[in-house]
A protein has these predicted regions:
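A conserved ligand/cofactor-binding region detector
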Residues: 1-755
Length: 755
């Protein structure tokens, strides 16, 4: 590595390792890493996976790729010997802005595991220039700005592949960029990202995300999830989705033909995993291409496509199961309309249940319905989630096709979420149980032999303290916020949505503030950390961020409370910031309304790094509890079935709880009390106050009191540090099940059957 670095620095910059700048060193390392991944053998076989997703939240790639190539430690040593720290060099990398939340991060973990297991499988998505948005806090509010991440030199490699995508009023030329995905000590796959050369980045002003949504040829791949609060925004999403699936379908068919396969046997050589409903149009688009360009009859095309496509459902929220008005499709992609109508007609001939039709009475096209009828597999992403799909949300489909439904509990790549973000913990685990866990995560169970070993438990606490100090330094440097490393670090980081209930955590912050003002000081100081972006058009979510930032300001300026309790919000939360905060956390907040979180993967990352979960009986929390035991997790709140029953009965009333419970009344009214109104925006705080009392769709007030009681117990339990550390060790030891390597092995065994 040293010799190669010297060569590249000399050739490119006429510098040496002792005279180059950090920026030059970063570019040299990137070049060497790209070269090394390019030289890896491609994972090949007679059947290939295409994982198609609107999001791939891949994070920074330099360190991740060095780890997977087996070059990380050598690189670290070389840099150290010349006075550099690799972690400082990687700070210079721009984080690719190709995803938003758990959906995109899961896709990234999956690509890592697919490559690591040596399976032939590529990702297909879009090359967003500005991503979701860059978040800035201004006047205690979220401000959205464009997030340009594509630099002159990046991980993107332009390919020769091009294709034509036909819309109603024009045709667009798709171009392809690839990012190499090296497996850990394995071969290499690719992430295919489609783009257009007519994109004009200048149509978006600085410090803004506003642009003319009708100029599709100039704006198509600028943003992930463009604001869909108007017709133009909704149509732009259809343009994006169709462009992605048409380019992807054309690439798939070309690769199959180039390999000499008969397209009538497509399902023997390709499998397409539809990640949530955004890529659903790949089904009618493949049928269109096969019938219009490859000489297939409609029957032949429908049959082979139905045997090739599989669908992953990621949500129980009806709002997230996309339904597009037929008139929009007629205005954007009229080519697909007769095919979708034909697919719906075929369902109507054999199925009497109208709720399962693809086109409903309002002339809306249900994407998930198309995926289920014309795919061979439907999977949920956690045991509880899949049961809810089968028994409630998708029951009518389960009754039709029970054999298609299966569960694949989500997982995370331990390369990024342990080896990369917590090397100190990784090395210590290695010293205790060897390095087998890097390839087989279930070997972490060997740690259970040390659960009563005081020296081991003390060392785990030391490592946690080191990570807290690193996080403290990072927050001071990036946001000017100081953190007490001796405090309990209590973290809720995830996209902002009412069902995830950041607002309930904020109500607890109000409770704690008032409690300390009343003279009840906690034994150990508490630092509550939030990190979240709210969708630009999601008003209440932005109001919740406003409330949290107002509480932060209130407490920071209160000398009575600040030494004992802090509320801090991470600005522009992303993968890089997750890698800083997760290893520092003592408590992992997973407090969604039971039955609403499909799985969650943050819960797994925190567990792996020795944080204890405070959560509801929801998503993968249930499986964490089953693995670690009731005594090593803190579960509170209504059970999933109780919540489902309440929705069905329509009897939940937050107003009743507010009026009858003095404590809840006091906490909710504090939102519009004089302390916060002196800091915040009255309209925003009043709207949130009104929402909690008048609607509270995700039943915040129902669980608030039990949440407060349970959280107080968690803080009290932290005082017995030996028992706490034992619980942390048990969580780490039992985290092996949540490796995405296990998830992918199950997908392959039961769905993909790659060869």
């Amino acid at each position: 590595m040293e010799k190669r670095l010297q060569e590249v620095l000399e050739k490119r910059f006429h510098k040496t390792l002792d005279t180059c700048t950090k920026e030059e060193l970063f570019h040299a390392l990137m070049e060497i890493t790209k070269e090394a991944t390019g030289n890896l053998k491609k994972n090949e076989g007679s059947k290939k996976l295409y994982y198609i997703s609107a999001e791939f939240l891949i994070g920074k790639l330099l360190s991740n790729n060095l780890i997977n190539l087996g070059l990380y430690e050598e690189t670290e040593k070389v840099l150290k010997s010349h006075g550099y720290e690799l972690c400082e060099i990687e700070e210079l990398e721009m984080e690719p802005s190709l995803g938003n939340g758990g959906l995109g991060r899961l896709a990234a973990c999956f690509l890592d595991s697919i490559a690591t297991l040596g399976l032939p499988g590529d990702g297909i998505g879009l090359n967003y220039h500005f991503g979701l948005f860059q978040q800035k806090f201004t006047n205690h509010k979220q401000q959205e700005m464009k997030n340009p991440w594509i630099t002159k030199e990046s991980w993107l490699n332009r390919q020769s592949f091009t294709c034509k995508v036909p819309f109603k009023d024009f045709t667009m030329d798709g171009v392809l960029y690839d990012i190499d995905v090296p497996g850990y000590d394995s071969g290499c796959n690719r992430l295919h990202l489609f783009d257009v050369d007519t994109i004009d980045e200048s149509i978006v002003p600085e410090n803004s995300i506003n642009f003319d949504k009708k100029k599709v040829q100039e704006n198509l791949t600028l943003f992930l999830y463009p604001d869909d609060s108007d017709d133009a925004g909704r149509k732009l999403r259809i343009y994006q989705q169709y462009f992605m699936v048409s380019c992807g379908a054309q690439l798939i068919l070309k690769e199959m033909e180039d390999a000499g396969y008969d397209l009538h046997e497509l399902n023997n050589h390709a499998v397409i995993q539809i990640n949530d409903t955004h890529p659903s149009m790949v089904i009618p688009e493949l049928i269109r291409l096969l019938t219009e360009e490859k000489g297939f009859t409609m029957d032949e095309a429908v049959e082979v496509v139905s045997k090739t496509c599989a669908y992953t459902n990621h949500t129980i929220l009806a709002e997230a199961l996309e339904k597009w008005p037929m008139e929009y499709l007629e205005e954007v992609v009229p080519n697909l309309v007769p095919i979708i109508k034909e697919l719906d007609e075929r369902v109507r001939k054999t199925v009497k249940d109208e709720s399962t039709y693809i086109i409903d009475a309002q002339d809306r096209v249900h994407m998930a319905h198309m995926d289920i009828h014309y795919g061979f597999s439907v999977n949920g992403v956690a045991a509880l989630h899949t049961e809810i799909l089968k028994n409630s949300e998708l029951k009518n489909f389960y009754d039709l096709y029970p054999e298609r439904f299966n569960n694949k509990t989500n997982g995370i790549t331990f390369r990024r979420w342990l080896m990369h973000c917590n090397p100190m913990l990784t090395r210590y685990i290695e010293s205790l149980i060897g390095n087998g866990f890097k390839k087989d995560a279930t070997e972490l169970e060997k740690l259970l032999a040390f659960k009563n070993d005081e020296a081991v438990l003390n060392k785990l606490e030391e490592i946690k303290m080191e990570k807290k100090l690193e996080f403290k330094e990072y927050m001071e440097k990036t946001q000017g916020l100081t953190i007490d490393e001796n405090s309990i670090i209590d973290v809720q980081v995830k996209r902002l949505h009412e069902y995830k209930r950041q607002q309930m955590n904020a109500l607890y912050a109000i409770y704690k503030y008032l409690d300390i003002k009343a003279g009840n000081k906690p034994s150990t100081p508490i630092t509550m950390i939030f990190g979240a972006k709210a969708a630009p058009a999601y008003v209440i979510a932005k109001d919740i961020i406003h409330l949290i930032l107002c509480l932060q300001e209130l407490i920071e300026k209160d000398p009575e409370v600040r030494p004992y309790f802090r509320v801090l919000m991470i600005e522009n939360y992303n993968v890089s910031k997750a890698a800083k905060v997760i290893p520092a956390a003592n408590i992992s907040e997973q407090i969604s309304l039971a039955s609403k979180e499909a799985s969650g993967t943050g819960n797994m990352k925190f567990m792996l790094n020795g944080a204890l979960t405070l959560g509801t009986e929801d998503g993968a929390n249930v499986e964490i509890r089953d693995l670690v035991g009731e005594e090593n997790i803190y579960i509170f709140g209504r059970k999933p079935q109780d919540v489902i029953d309440l929705y069905e009965a329509g009897t939940y009333s937050s107003k009743e709880i507010y009026e009858e419970d003095a404590l809840i009344h006091k906490l909710v009214d504090f939102i519009t009390g004089e302390e916060l109104l002196a800091i915040g925006d009255e309209e925003s705080l009043t709207r949130l106050h009104r929402e909690l009392i008048g609607k509270d769709w995700f039943m915040t007030l129902l669980d608030t009191k039990e949440y407060i009681t349970t959280k107080e117990k968690v803080y009290a339990d932290y005082e017995d540090r030996k028992t706490w550390n034992k619980k942390a060790l048990i969580n780490i030891a039992k985290a092996g099940f949540f490796s995405s390597d296990r998830t992918i092995a199950q997908y392959n065994e039961e769905i993909w059957k790659l060869k």
